[in-house]
Amino acid sequence: MSSFRSHTSGELRKSHVGETVRLAGWVHRKRDHGGLLFIDLRDNYGLTQLVFDPDRAEAFALAEKLRAEYVVAIEGKVVARSAETINANLPTGDIEIAVSSMEVLSEAQDLPLPVFGEPDYPEDIRLTYRFLDLRRETLHRNILLRSKIIADIRRRMTEVGFNEFQTPILTASSPEGARDFLVPSRMHPGKFYALPQAPQQFKQLIMVAGFDRYFQIAPCFRDEDARADRSPGEFYQLDVEMSFVTQDDVFAAIEPVLHGLFEKFAEGKKVSSYPFTRIPYAEAIRKYGSDKPDLRNPIVMESVTDHFRGSGFKVFAGLIEKDSKVEVWAIPAPGGGNRAFCDRMNSWAQGEGQPGLGYIFFREEGGALEGAGPVAKNIGPERTEAIRTQLGLKAGDAVFFVAGVPAKTASFAGLARTRVGTELGLIEEDIFKFCWIVDFPMFEWNEDEKKIDFSHNPFSMPNYPLDKFLKLDKDNADEILGMTAFQYDIVCNGVELSSGAIRNHKPDVMYKAFEIAGYDKSVVETKFGGMLNAFKYGAPPHGGLAPGIDRMVMLLAGVENLREVTMFPMNQQAQDLLMQAPSEVEPKQLKELHIRVVPPLEKKKEG
């Protein structure tokens, strides 16, 4: 294998007994057992137990001086462990190495965090000493898993006819989305490049250039605040674009890739079969309170507005009477039919800034089924029974209610649905459930600016007859706000993996879409001139999507923070503690770039 080793620390088995081998790696753990020294040697591939006998005086003396994380190379004979010392939890647990010679390749200082074991350590220490953190078993395994997933994606995409192309890292600033990371130009004073938020325009230009099927494991850069599932700096996505396709064609191409990928790395979990479930956006909001529903949770919300209209529960009845847009949504809670659970959910809702969470729980009383709680008392037995019948509830079940204008209350209702499902143990644990969210609204009403605006992606093709679309004006507001687009998200277990769309490749339709949203033609030409100009020279119908690599790896690794699947992440303040970035630069460098740093103004103290 090399002059340092004949085998790795993860490959030796009983079949190697009697062989003389060379290994190299890190001292993982050291133990003294009555004269013999035992050392677990670790490398990228696993652990092997080394045995040092005092009869081998030179090697033994050297072993006595070893400390954790020293790097050593050894030579010795593979011997079988005795029956009582076999370690069934270790792939190499049937053997050990009787060391005859050893060389210390590198020493290690006292460790700021342990590599052995998985203790919780402060994030700042873990990121400052990331090279040590990466030696820890779980994180090391996650990073290797990421590599395998990316390699498998590349193989699958190539096998179904996609070509991998690289797009520029230095590009123009984008007027849409998050803040750009700007790069000053030395050759063009006062002008800036931007790191790409996504290769969106480039991948569409690749379609215009006639390459038909493109993919890339694309780095994307956005100057935005961190979240558990979002880096403050860069992230990677499986960027995909296809020519001469409909929405159905895109789904048919990507579903086998994602299904096969997840099935391969699911570690025994099931993966929902394809074609994946398709849920219109409006239905997702109504049933699940979210456009990224977790379908492992069986709870489906229903409207029970009519059961409260004119009822004795004045809080809801009053809201319904005042505003025709108000709805009351019911969140069934199978098995949650006791006052303690209902009160706990009510307290949770108050902690979320809500006045509370109305509920009814059902119980058998004297052989009869009855609803209990303040809501049931106020609306009476007839309405209570109608709600129970509609939702199919039985004794021992409960139902919670959220009332208001859906646009304002849907998000909280979705949180309550998730909370109920989690608290009652209703969520399936051993499955990856995919779905598509389709039929997103093309436009929405911007209440702050009192105007029609784009709802999501301004470059999507409207799901509307194009000849009629070109004739629309602001007098057709209801028609415009009811229009959907060929936009879609793919969701797995409540995690949005990707947005995508069939693109608007027709300049006249694009001009019209921006006009409806209040943008002048000149603005479109200034901001998107490169792509728009290309569309004037024969553009095929095209569409695509871009599932996030980080989020897919997080799901498959079973972790909730992307720092557990990213090799060198930034912290929450967008700092790289290991490399000490961002940092100040030399005045000479700023001068070459024609830049002067102006310190931020200090805020005036009040009073």
From Swiss-Prot:
SUPFAM superfamilies: Class II aaRS and biotin synthetases, GAD domain-like, Nucleic acid-binding proteins. It comes from the Bacteria. Residues 200-203 are annotated as: Aspartate. It catalyses: tRNA(Asx) + L-aspartate + ATP = L-aspartyl-tRNA(Asx) + AMP + diphosphate. It is an enzyme of class 6 (ligase). ATP binds at residues 222-224, 496, 548-551. Its EC number is 6.1.1.23. Gene3D superfamilies: Bira Bifunctional Protein, Domain 2 (3.30.930.10), GAD-like domain (3.30.1360.30), Nucleic acid-binding proteins (2.40.50.140). Keywords: Aminoacyl-tRNA synthetase, ATP-binding, Cytoplasm, Ligase, Nucleotide-binding, Protein biosynthesis. The record marks 33 as: Important for tRNA non-discrimination. GO terms for cellular component: cytoplasm. One of its GO terms (biological process) is aspartyl-tRNA aminoacylation. L-aspartate binds at residues 176, 222, 456, 503. It is found in: Cytoplasm. GO terms for molecular function: aspartate-tRNA ligase activity; aspartate-tRNA(Asn) ligase activity; ATP binding; nucleic acid binding. Belongs to the class-II aminoacyl-tRNA synthetase family. Type 1 subfamily. HAMAP family: Asp_tRNA_synth_type1. This is Aspartate--tRNA(Asp/Asn) ligase. It comes from Parvibaculum lavamentivorans (strain DS-1 / DSM 13023 / NCIMB 13966). The lineage of its organism: Bacteria, Pseudomonadati, Pseudomonadota, Alphaproteobacteria, Hyphomicrobiales. The gene is aspS.
